[in-house]
Structures are given as C-alpha cells and as structure tokens.
Amino acid sequence: MNQTNAHATNRTVHDADSHITESGGWMEDYASEYVKSNLDKPFIDLENIPQLKPIFEQAKNRLAGNDPELTERLKSDLYGNPGKRNLMAAYGAVDGEERRDSLDIAGINSQIVFPGLVFFSRFANSKDPKVVYGGSEAMNRAMVDFCAADSRRLLSVGYLPLKDPALSLESAKQAIEMGVKSFWLRSDAVEGRAPSHVAYDPIWALLEEAGVPIVLHIGS
C-alpha cells in the first residue's frame, strides 16, 4: 500500500518537533578555525561506540551513494523499516533533500527542524564568548543549509545564546538574515539572568518584529 494512502486529503499536517542527527564533523564544516580548535568534545561520541559503529558506517556508505538499494528500501517503507530507528541511518536524518522527500511520503505539509544536542555538548557551555557565539553561528548556518532543500516547508530552528545581551542581539539579527525560522533558548538562568530579564527586551522586540518565535525545553 502506498504510504500516503493512510493520510486524509484536504488536511494540513504540521510536525512541530523533528530533529536532525549530526554526523561527526558536521559543525566543524561551518566553524571558523578558532571555534573548531576550541570546541568541546561531544558528551557522547556515538560514532565511536563499538556497537554503533557498523550502523554509522552503513549510513555513511549509503549517503555516499554506494547503496541505492538500501536507500530505496528505507524510502519505500518509511514507517516500517527497522533502519528508521538507527539515528544517522534513517531516511532523511542527515540529508535535507531526503527530509523534504520524506515529508511528501508521510503527507506532512511542513516541519520544524531542531538540531540534536550538539550545541549543549560542543560550545554552549564554553567560558569563551567567542566559542559560544561563533559556535552558535556555525550551527545556525548548518541548520539553514539542511533546510534549504525546501525552506518554505523545512523550518530551521537555530540556537540563541544569552550569555551577553548585546552579543545575543547581534547574533539574533545575523541568524534571522541567514534564514533561521525560530530560536531554541535555554530555559535556565544565564549569568544570573532568566530569559524574562529586561536586558533581553531588545531581543524580544526584534524577534516580535521579524515574526520569529522562540522555543524552550523546560529543565534543559
């Protein structure tokens, strides 16, 4: 049965919580040399866990175009193929064009696309503002690039650090110009300031004017 047959027609479906899976070196491709050399190591290096190595190697091989049969199996059975559970191996997990196609298959009109946990583990906790804001810029560019396959339907979520209100305002302006459609904020206090602190009011005014929402994950 065609996978889209189960979806009713004349209905708008919006996926409000999707993520990408970041492969090794994903962020480094967008970062300056300074940021690259000062990124923290991932708190979980998935690709070097012995049990997961075969999955990642298979995924890399497929994404390089060396296993079209596997790609077709994943695509033709988007919901049922066991490969969908295997992080990077899933169809559309790391490739924007595959993600766009997966929306068509699933009958989804649009999708908010979050990063994984790369920002928490690589730069957001750095004591160096250059790394925090440079890392944020790199990740935001990577997210916009992923969603460029169909930026009308794939809505990129960037990260907005709140370490320094003035730098955060410039970071928000830059990311909006890039094409970031929403910002993920940390819900806890940063430098003793909650997100509701008046020092951030110019940022909220900018986002309101641009029509760019913020999202929070309480407790993280």
Regions found by a protein language model. Name each.
Residues 1-220:
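Helix-coil boundary/capping segments in enzymes
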